[in-house]
A protein has these predicted regions:
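Flexible C-terminal active-site loop/helix
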Residues: 105-135
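Conserved short secondary-structure transition element at the edge of the structured enzyme core
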Residues: 38-43, 80-115
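Catalytic alpha/beta core domains of metabolic enzymes, predominantly
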Residues: 1-80, 86-87
Length: 135
């Protein structure tokens, strides 16, 4: 898993892996670069975004597998938007708790030192998700 978003570096890693261990799978660790990684030979992605929006990540995988460029573009841009919402606070996993609650899935509260969004922040986030067609 390469958690970076530098696709030139990912391509270099892929060349090394393909030369040394062709049976080894290298995957991007960010859904924001899943399409690029797939085009460079990755067969999957380790995507934190899939914790909250698995349907979008699975749809992107299907579009990539089918070569549907228009759908790939649409979904990749949607994932980048979702990641922006997940990043409104420094720790994306903590925001994911609130995103899941907004979607109707109560997974409790984040453990300290992480914290939940304020009611205002949650309300604003819900509105952004609605306006984006994500809920």
């Amino acid at each position: 898993k390469d958690s970076g978003t530098d696709m030139a570096a990912f391509g270099e890693f892929m060349n090394i892996v393909n030369n040394k261990s062709p049976d080894f799978d290298l995957m991007p660790g960010s859904a924001s670069v899943f399409s690029s990684g797939f085009l460079l030979g990755a067969e999957a992605c380790v995507a934190g975004t899939s914790m909250v929006f698995p349907d979008i990540v699975v749809a992107l995988y299907d579009a990539l597998s089918n070569g549907d460029l228009e759908k790939i573009r649409e979904l990749q841009l949607k994932i980048i938007k979702v990641r922006g919402y997940q990043s409104i606070k420094p720790l994306r996993p903590a925001v994911s708790y609130d995103l899941l609650k907004i979607k109707g899935v109560d997974v409790g509260v984040p453990r300290k030192p992480w914290y939940q969004l304020s009611k205002k922040e949650c309300s604003d986030l819900r509105e952004k998700l609605k306006n984006s067609g994500l809920i």
